[in-house]
From Swiss-Prot:
Keywords: Isomerase, Mitochondrion, mRNA processing, Transit peptide, tRNA processing. It is an enzyme of class 5 (isomerase). This is Pseudouridylate synthase TRUB2, mitochondrial. It comes from Mus musculus. One of its GO terms (cellular component) is mitochondrial matrix. The active site is at D98 (nucleophile). Its EC number is 5.4.99.-, 5.4.99.25. Belongs to the pseudouridine synthase TruB family. One of its GO terms (biological process) is tRNA processing. Forms a regulatory protein-RNA complex, consisting of RCC1L, NGRN, RPUSD3, RPUSD4, TRUB2, FASTKD2 and 16S mt-rRNA. It comes from the Eukaryota.
């Protein structure tokens, strides 16, 4: 029952998580919708069993009864007897989003859960759009937090913001090379830098590979951030630190993930599409791309000659303190 439907539920797919929804509740909702779809499928024909039933003797006018072998359907597998065929599914969740954040969230069903581990090991970058609001600071870096101070921002310009973003990107790119454990003078490091495939080989602090301002209309501004090993709270703190470098203050009003590895907004299923058929189609559509990208990253990893690492490479400081290290260059 539903074996064909279950066979197509093996792989990775992406959904769009709205703000205000916990990832755990999202996973439970998707699981319930999948179970509902699987159990609603037409069940196979029941098995036939031979039973001896009383019946009239054929060709006889006398009212005599005899036992006759008769094929009858077996009800042991009927859903009203056994209950629903599927009662739970194991669904894995990729790089998670906190309650306030929204955007692309990768989920896995069946053998796709092992592919999530491959995604983690590939250290793929993720894209975010982050909205900020100048002029105030709160205790949790969010607009709804407890107000700590209000500041003026008339002196803030787009050019000054762009300079600070350039400092952040430059410092994090240096840290990225360091955590990749590459020989900075080698041809390999140069070629990987040109291809844009330099990635850390182990755990590291949040690393930003790209950051730019998409929109600037004080007090509001919109940033695009490409990063890895981040949390959404770290991105909110980044907005706060940018405000300090601008000699004012800032809070984060939105964190939205637009890409997670090889899944983008176009791949993410909206809430109205969280059903069996849409998810099956999404898994089938993504499967060739997932296999190709993971194979590509595996080849890069095998071809990467990793140098010995002892703690933080070459005495590098935490790149989260980038602003303090090089703030003077943005002034």
């Amino acid at each position: 029952m539903g074996s064909s439907g279950l066979a197509r539920l093996q792989g990775l797919f992406a959904v769009y998580k709205p703000p205000g929804l916990k990832w755990l509740h999202l996973r439970e909702t998707v699981e319930l919708q999948l179970l509902k779809g699987l159990n609603a499928q037409q069940p196979p024909a029941p098995d036939q069993r031979v039973r001896f039933l009383l019946g009239p003797v054929e060709g006889s006018e006398e009212k005599k009864l005899t036992l006759r072998a008769t094929n009858v359907p077996s009800l042991t597998t009927h859903r009203l007897v056994r209950g629903p065929a599927f009662t739970n599914l194991k669904i894995g969740v990729g790089h998670r989003l906190d309650v306030q954040a929204s955007g692309v969230l990768v989920l896995a069903v069946g053998h796709g859960r092992s592919l999530l581990t491959d995604m983690y090991d590939a250290h793929l970058t993720k894209d975010y759009t982050v909205r900020g609001l100048l002029g105030k600071a709160t205790d949790n870096f969010c607009e709804d937090g407890r107000l700590i101070e209000k500041t003026t921002y008339d002196h803030v310009t787009r050019e000054r913001l762009d300079r600070i973003l350039a400092v952040i990107q430059g410092s994090h790119q240096k840290a990225l090379v360091m955590y990749s454990n590459l020989d900075l003078k080698s041809q390999e490091a140069y070629e990987m830098a040109v291809q844009g495939v330099i990635r850390p080989m182990n755990k590291s602090p949040m690393l930003i590979s790209g950051i730019r301002c998409l929109h600037f209309a004080p007090p509001e501004f919109l940033l695009e951030v490409q990063c890895m090993h981040e949390t959404q709270q770290q991105l909110r703190k980044l907005v706060h630190e940018i405000g300090l470098e601008l000699k004012t203050s800032a809070v984060c009003t939105q964190v939205r993930r637009t890409r997670d590895g090889f899944f983008g907004l176009d791949d993410a299923l909206l809430r109205t599409q969280w059903d069996l058929h849409n998810i099956q189609d999404a898994i089938q559509a993504a499967a060739p791309r997932v296999a190709a990208e993971l194979q590509k990253n595996l080849s890069l990893k095998l071809g990467h000659h990793q140098l010995p690492s002892t703690g933080q490479p070459w005495g590098l400081k935490d790149p989260s303190s980038t602003l303090e290290l090089e703030s003077c260059s943005g002034q």
